[in-house]
Amino acid sequence: MEPGVRARSGAPQPASPVLWRARPAGGGGASSWLLLDGNSWLLCYGFLYLALYAQVSQSKPCERTGSCFSGRCVNSTCLCDPGWVGDQCQHCQGRFKLTEPSGYLTDGPINYKYKTKCTWLIEGYPNAVLRLRFNHFATECSWDHMYVYDGDSIYAPLVAVLSGLIVPEVRGNETVPEVVTTSGYALLHFFSDAAYNLTGFNIFYSINSCPNNCSGHGKCTTSVSVASQVYCECDKYWKGEACDIPYCKANCGSPDHGYCDLTGEKLCVCNDSWQGPDCSLNVPSTESYWILPNVKPFSPSVGRASHKAVLHGKFMWVIGGYTFNYSSFQMVLNYNLESSIWNVGAVSRGPLQRYGHSLALYQENIFMYGGRMETSDGNVTDELWVFNVRSQSWSTKTPTVLGHSQQYAVEGHSAHIMELDSRDVVMIVIFGYSAIYGYTSSIQEYHISSNTWLVPETKGAIVQGGYGHTSVYDEVTKSIYVHGGYKALPGNKYGLVDDLYKYEVNTRTWTILKESGFARYLHSAVLINGAMLIFGGNTHNDTSLSNGAKCFSADFLAYDIACDEWKTLPKPNLHRDVNRFGHSAVVINGSMYIFGGFSSVLLNDILVYKPPNCKAFRDEELCRNAGPGIKCVWNKNHCESWESGNTNNILRAKCPPKTAATDDRCYRYADCASCTANTNGCQWCDDKKCISASSNCSTSVRNYTKCHIRNEQICNKLTSCKSCSLNLNCQWDQRQQECQALPAHLCGEGWNHVGDACLRINSSRESYDNAKLYCYNLSGNLASLTTSKEVEFVLDEIQKFTQQKVSPWVGLRKINISYWGWEDMSPFTNTSLQWLPGEPNDSGFCAYLERAAVAGLKANPCTSMADGLVCEKPVVSPNQNARPCKKPCSLRTSCANCTSSGMECMWCSSTKRCVDSNAYIISFPYGQCLEWQTATCSPQNCSGLRTCGQCLEQPGCGWCNDPSNTGRGYCIEGSSRGPMKLAGVHNSDVVLDTSLCPKEKNYEWSFIQCPACQCNGHSTCINNNVCEQCKNLTTGRQCQECMPGYYGDPTNGGQCTACTCGGHANVCHLHTGKCFCTTKGIKGDQCQLCDSENRYVGNPLRGTCYYSLLIDYQFTFSLLQEDDRHHTAINFIANPEQSNKNLDISINASNNFNLNITWSVGSTGGTISGEETPIVSKTNIKEYRDSFSYEKFNFRSNPNITFYVYVSNFSWPIKIQIAFSQHNTIMDLVQFFVTFFSCFLSLLLVAAVVWKIKQTCWASRRREQLLRERQQMASRPFASVDVALEVGAEQTDFLRGPLEGAPKPIAIEPCAGNRAAVLTVFLCLPRGSSGAPPPGQSGLAIASALIDISQQKPSDNKDKTSGVRNRKHLSTRQGTCV
């Protein structure tokens, strides 16, 4: 037994008990014994595994506990057994061989690691039956797979591909999936990618044991006829190979309901009025049920997935499909639904095998379109084949593509044939995935009578097409209902959807219906009594974290067409799991028949669903509420099925009231048409937002016919560059990897954007020269129609002129006698446009388009008149990322070409196919790709692998060790028994050929582990695995690398070659030989160039390279990057600029260095030895300064004198500063004073300017302050006061009475606290004898004084206060000036 693999001796005997001893936790206590029968031994292994998992996952490092899962602890480090890796040897990574009669295998006690490749070979004896039980299996769905082969290599028949969560759903352990091989061998290969990892798997195996331990309903017995083989003796009322099928439950209700047939097929035979697997349901019944019919013959070769089935009479015709092995595959099968018998179609010639195609039946013919071909390249086809049921013969159709349509080669699509209201019979092909154009959202129509193909324009909602959806056609509503699929999602993402669309075939209108809430693809759909039944499918939609979604589903959903409602139906209540995807379903007599599919293995069973019968409902209320899964109507005192009624049944359907949609539900629709063409109750608001119809909106649209379709809405649905380029208004952004709409202003008003040009058609009658001038005035020229897009556009536009004849000039004229050319100087090729018969004639040298029965060119004199002209001008794309489309991934045939575009494509090395990254899952839905690459490419054949370790990493390779036993050998395709080769040139089968590694010549074949001695042919081994002495200039533990100073690939006897670096490097790249130059500024693979772009000069072939320094500048060199790691030297040169000044040098560095300085006057200095004269030689310094005298070195007589500085022997990283300078030692007084006064005057001028600015600012602020003060004073309260003046002895007359009392102030302004105030009075100034004031002076003045008012009497205060508050009051007393 191989190390690291757990096994136990002896096969389990189900009938014998097993004793297990359990000890309580803690150091003491009594022991207890648990007695288990043989049916529970797997359960014990599961507990043991979980206990081991918990112990290892919580274990401490090896230095503390010494725990290693598959290895031993040595010096606190785990030394792993072969095939195990990790700090605790907890991950598998290699090959294992198991030879025990039974045992188990696992990826490890914790989650498996990323990029894991593990292989197990279980070896029994020839033709032994080997059973695998997957008691635990959890991997990333559709990405991480376990492959099981019935043999000892991957070239043996494939029997199972496991992925996702394998969880039994029925009665626990007895339904654990079991895989069987019959060759005596089983090869299991596991591969995981780099997305996320799960808990892995725990697989039990046993040789010649009973299937599923007889499911607990039988006894495992040894066969009498064939020794060493066992079989199950089933208990009563159980049958099947594993005793897992119950029969005659409750004795079939005998005798009233039926009886049990114990001698024949062991099933219930019901009386006429009873039905069901146990005859417990009435005929007709108000309940539904599932059954598994007994199929005859039950051949495994029938199993397939992604096939298609149609019903013709009592036969279900099954065509195509995917299978593991096509050697015995039958393209056409039919199943008799009455007798449950399979028949193989007697077809001699026909199409190649394919899957993912579509089938549609019309009369006696079955139309098959598209699909993925099962050939070496695996291309998607656009072939249209017709199979005649009566003659059982194939014929092919080549339809004519109408107009400017495109026939898409698709897979994962669906098709239906119906008769339109126009009496035209048409096959409608819905969606699908095209390897060239990506996920298509188009409808394709094939008109059978005219044999024509068309891609029509559709109305209504803008829908998104995809792969693996299902669709049904309803005769009542004349519509096709499309559900689910794998699609392109917003934000350049891809995944499953739960969308439901309705396509009205006569009006070509899309409507979005209520989604199911359960995303899936590769499911089935049928229509029964007004309900669309959805079964199974792949529901895994996780991307970075597993949420428990299963790859294989048994979900059962029902959609009520009349009420737009979804219901979840109970899953099939059968004796085993029926999870699957990629199956087919048909309807006969109101029952659904499901066939085949994929659930880790290819299924060949048939499931039958019998829905309730409307006739069984006797009450009107029960009839109307029948369901889910069935639609009934009450008609004249009896209940009948939906299909038996007329089209008015929709109006009479009783549906639950629909709740108004919320705004959040409507927000998902980004365009007006999809917002209004759905059943969710939404409206399109004027601010380009979809909201609920119950929400307020100033201007809304509620009918899709009122919507304006914008280019952005169309372009966003195109998922590939090719499909984007087909739309003239879209362009592909290579950086964002999305299709974007071209702005409408690219060409301007009146112009049409067509391809890379703008075209404009004018119907005016002009000569050629005037037409050319007209276009010139519009910044264009007469159109050069060199592309098919431009020709098609012009021809279409000409047809729109119905009121007048338009035969426009185009930019084509005769250059010389025999040469016609376009205005853009391109030659006329007679491909996109052709001359009319008899043209060109000799009468004219200019061409125009003649709209005849067939539009074409006609020559005319350039001075004559033509009816119209076509102008053209270039268009400049605003998106700089828009470039021509790259080659589609599917057309790239090598790994290098496939992975050259970054992450756009993925290369599958096992199938030699390149696929789009966004379509990897649908390109390999059944795990056909064993390994993929997106960046680095590994050798595509075993022969390209040079070491045994690399060889055994690939599951299809083995290593042939040569007789030298030094590790040399060669890698070749093979199995555990020996190497293999192709059986023939045109035969893809491989056969064993031991002569490729002859054992008689002492060659050794290794398939599980490499030979112990792995010295690559450069040394012999001591102690079996230690290389004694590496020769041939090699080094390393296995002599796998070249010695320093040499390069090459010494693996498997390769040679090492000396590095060629011209003395400028000590080492080079070990594999490429590129030299790591030690002098900064020298570059090239062989250090043969100077880095002239960065001011390095010289010739490294004859000397070295120097950095040219400038005088009076300081340079800093930071050798800190990883590219500078090998640099240990840098050189400089400098030439004095002035002949009368000394040359100073200053250099310092962050690390110690050696310094050598030389000088030369010749032009060959630095290249010829002896031309330089040494000046300075220093070692191990960090700083140096010096000055070279111009007199000593005679700068004046040696104008070409050059100084060379060599800095060497420093360590990385380092920072170096160096400067050469020339200046006088005696200060020039004149220059000093000139400089001083210049600076002084400049400073003075700056000070003056600053002072002036300050003064200006101060004056401005002062003016503003005065203005504010005046405004404040002007806003103070004011009043008028009457003043009585005495002039001499005269009294004033205008007062009523004499003045009384003392003079009063004109104002009193109290201060805070009312203890002081400002008193204001009028004063009479001194006057002359005449009574008049002196000239130039005033006779009056206003005086103010601060007075104390705290001692005044209350009466006085009252009077004063009154006087202040009533300033307008006229005093009645005579006043006197004081």
Swiss-Prot record:
Residues in EGF-like domain copies: 52-90, 206-244
Compartment list: Cell membrane
Domain of life of the source: Eukaryota
Domain (C-type lectin) ranges: 754-872
Keywords associated with the record: Cell membrane, Disulfide bond, EGF-like domain, Glycoprotein, Kelch repeat, Laminin EGF-like domain, Lectin, Membrane, Repeat, Signal, Transmembrane, Transmembrane helix
GO MF entry, a single one: carbohydrate binding
Region ranges (Interaction with MC4R): 1287-1324
GO CC annotations, alphabetized: plasma membrane
Extent of the Kelch repeats: 315-364, 366-414, 426-474, 479-530, 532-590, 591-637
Tissue expression: Highly expressed in brain, heart, lung, kidney and liver. In the central nervous system, it is highly expressed in the dentate gyrus, CA1-3 regions of the hippocampus, and the ventral taenia tecta.
Cysteine pairs bridged by disulfides in the record: 62-78, 80-89, 92-118, 210-220, 214-232, 234-243, 775-871, 1013-1021, 1015-1027, 1030-1039, 1042-1056, 1059-1068, 1061-1075, 1077-1087, 1090-1105
Disruption phenotype: Mice are grossly normal with no alterations of pigmentation, central nervous system pathology or body weight. In contrast, constitutive expression of Atrnl1 in mice lacking Atrn display normal, agouti-banded hairs and significantly delayed onset of spongiform neurodegeneration, indicating that overexpression of Atrnl1 compensates for loss of Atrn.
Membrane topology category: Single-pass membrane protein
Domain Laminin EGF-like, first and last residues per copy: 1013-1058, 1059-1107
Domain PSI as annotated: residue spans: 613-656, 665-708, 714-759, 888-938, 941-1011
Disordered: annotated segments: 1351-1378
Protein task: May play a role in melanocortin signaling pathways that regulate energy homeostasis.
Identification of the protein by name: Attractin-like protein 1
Gene name in the database record: Atrnl1
